[in-house]
Amino acid sequence: MTDNRVENSSGRAARKLRLALMGPAFIAAIGYIDPGNFATNIQAGASFGYQLLWVVVWANLMAMLIQILSAKLGIATGKNLAEQIRDHYPRPVVWFYWVQAEIIAMATDLAEFIGAAIGFKLILGVSLLQGAVLTGIATFLILMLQRRGQKPLEKVIGGLLLFVAAAYIVELFFSQPDMAQLGKGMVIPALPNPEAVFLAAGVLGATIMPHVIYLHSSLTQHLHGGTRQQRYSATKWDVAIAMTIAGFVNLAMMATAAAAFHFSGHTGIADLDQAYLTLEPLLSHAAATVFGLSLVAAGLSSTVVGTLAGQVVMQGFVRFHIPLWVRRTITMLPSFIVILMGLDPTRILVMSQVLLSFGIALALVPLLIFTSNATLMGELVNTRRVKQVGWIIVVLVVALNIWLLVGTVMGLS
């Protein structure tokens, strides 16, 4: 009887700890459903139907492993990835890493900020510039929560993640995808032509986010409660739940685009405005509105996450700190320049995702090296199987990027 009571008590304590440590992965997961994903997934679904769904499935599984490794590094060492690189690599390498990480963070933020601005434009009927102003104001308000600590921000961003997931459940209901074809697309790999390879690289870039690899290790480095092993166990649950939601959203985006556009002959849908305007007559005004609202929610939350990641990168690599509002102001400028110059915002979104895919290996290689170091990690060091899978992911990413670069140079994409 006493043993049962102790067992129940320890079980409740474990669940309580798991709940208390839930949150960091939800902030990281928001980076996986940003407006760049909308643009890339819609274009892929409209152009190739369900044929590229397998890329989303595998990219999401890779992302799960990567985020677990990132979170584990913070738990085991009390330092984030940028700080570990600063401590272990020569100064020129550290400065190179800092510059490329800042460029990638800004490219990410460009996609996220413009995506939210497009969402405001679509649902409110304002200009893109006015939508950008609204986005700026909204992100400043959300960032103010950071003054109250990490938990309030986790709750708001987690809520926005769940809102986007709910929105895509509604979109699936409206679009009625062919479940047999959807299932086939998820499990049977296909790259029918060079354009599909280009979009597959974009999907990979949109799904595995370099800036959140840096951020997640920072979000877990100050976690308290339980042993390191217990914190790691709770974090695996956190990552599994958050990334499953993000993976569902990405699959639903592409499946909705395939069902609504590809199979109705609208295979040329390549921008978010066009997607919104085409959804209304094809499905309903409600479907188009839900799409616009989900775009705003994803854009606002992910641009906040991008700002936080940029701060982590700067502090970690070069020990330099600027107020969040200053960083937010600076990183908004490229978005306003793109809008004022009249550049195609959706093309900018897709190109930014391709750029991101080049930063994945640069973040992954040191992450794998550090998490495989028994001196640093102790009992949380990577197993041989994890090391093998990790290096396979690096090789795949690099190979896909070389293919993408060659294809782009030759004018195939």
From Swiss-Prot:
Task: Quote the function comment for this protein.
Answer: H(+)-stimulated, divalent metal cation uptake system. Involved in manganese and iron uptake.
Q: Report what the protein is called.
A: Divalent metal cation transporter MntH
Q: Which NCBIfam families match?
A: nramp, Nramp_1, PRK00701.1
Q: What is a single molecular function from GO for this protein?
A: metal ion binding
Disulfide-bonded cysteine pairs: these are none
Q: Which family does the record claim for this protein?
A: Belongs to the NRAMP family.
What are the UniProt keywords, alphabetically? Answer: Cell inner membrane, Cell membrane, Ion transport, Iron, Manganese, Membrane, Symport, Transmembrane, Transmembrane helix, Transport
> HAMAP family, per this entry?
NRAMP
Principal place where this protein is found? Answer: membrane
Gene, per the UniProt record = mntH
Membrane-spanning regions, if any? Answer: 20-39, 52-71, 96-118, 126-145, 156-175, 197-220, 239-258, 277-297, 328-344, 351-370, 388-406
